[in-house]
From Swiss-Prot:
This is Cell division protein FtsB. Belongs to the FtsB family. Residues 22-103 are periplasmic. It comes from Cronobacter sakazakii (strain ATCC BAA-894). One of its GO terms (biological process) is FtsZ-dependent cytokinesis. The keyword Cell cycle applies. Essential cell division protein. May link together the upstream cell division proteins, which are predominantly cytoplasmic, with the downstream cell division proteins, which are predominantly periplasmic.
């Protein structure tokens, strides 16, 4: 009975060592689970970006309004007879308040 107990105890120690420190053990599992979570977050961001790009492609393929909007915003194009006005914010508002005079 003593040899069987010793053999079972040795087997238990070996199994515990393999579980905690061996290949595909608890540490590897937690590391891979963290890697999977990071990859899923990255994939979700890229999927949202792809969906946005596909929607933009559909808009551009669908009609002239999207093309016209892009031409107006990115190239500052206007229709004949229109006047283009660019509104520039006041320099004092951009700097965070009125300019102070140091005397």
């Amino acid at each position: 009975m003593g040899k069987l107990t010793l053999l079972l105890l040795a087997l238990l120690v070996w199994l515990q060592y393999s579980l905690w420190f061996g290949k595909n053990g608890i540490h590897d599992y937690s590391r891979v689970a963290d890697d999977v979570a990071v990859q899923q977050a990255t994939n979700a961001k890229l999927k949202a970006r792809n969906d946005q790009l596909f929607a933009e492609i559909d808009d551009l393929n669908g009609g002239q309004e999207a093309i016209e909007e892009r031409a107006r915003n990115e190239l500052s194009m206007t229709k004949p007879g229109e006047t283009f006005y660019r509104l520039v914010p006041d320099a004092t508002k951009r700097a965070g308040g009125p300019a102070q005079n140091n005397r």
